[in-house]
Structures are given as C-alpha cells and as structure tokens.
C-alpha cells in the first residue's frame, strides 16, 4: 500500500458529499483505478539479497476478484529497474493468469474445462503453478459422489 496509499477518508464516510481525492469521491473507485482491485491485499513477502547487486521479493496475497495489476504497473513505473512477475488465480470465477512488467497480461478463463481438457485451454506452466488439473479432478470426483448419493436417495 506504500506505492499507492489509500486516501484518507473524510467525515461521514458513507453519507453526504465526500471530498474528492485524486478525482474520486469514494474508496471503491479510487482502489479500482489505483490497485486494479477493491481491497488492499494482505501481503506475505520474503526478501532475498541475491548478492549480485539484485534482490528477489517473493510472496503471496489475497485480493478481491481481480489481480492488482494497476498497483504493480505503478510500482514498475516508480522503479523502472524492477522486473515484476505475478501469477494469479480466482477459482470462484475460473480465471488464471500471469502478468509481468515487460510483456503484459497472459489471462485465461477455464469455466468449461475439465481435468482432462484444462491443458488444452491453459498453458502448462499455469496449470502446474496452481495444480489446476489436480483440483479439477478432486472437484469432479466430489460431484460424481454427490450424484451417486442423490441417485441412492431418489
């Protein structure tokens, strides 16, 4: 949140007129434009000095509904010598991707995929990153068990 800090809210946050902050009168539209998602993420990061004049920061975080691409774009503009690569997945909305500061966004939807067809839709590196084939196989197995139970009940 230090690269694009949340604006301080005015009094009466939910009623009446709000002060404009960077052209926004509410936290939601400000966050969506500046972070690319509605929440500031709870971040878990590890810093490693590569002992060659570079460093690596790795970690994970949860965000709401979308990867915070706008936040990473802002960070990469502030630190032009910084290369950023972000893998993301939203299992409830069935999308996955990889964004980097040099090549942009590699985004895929997989709502129609099965454990057998996922690699036809999604590149292997993303399937492996998130174990999509294994997770879909587990889901399919659970669905089959539920159907079998329903048939017994009926």
Where are these regions (language model features)?
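Intrinsic low-complexity, intrinsically disordered or marginally ordered coil/linker segments
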Residues: 1-154
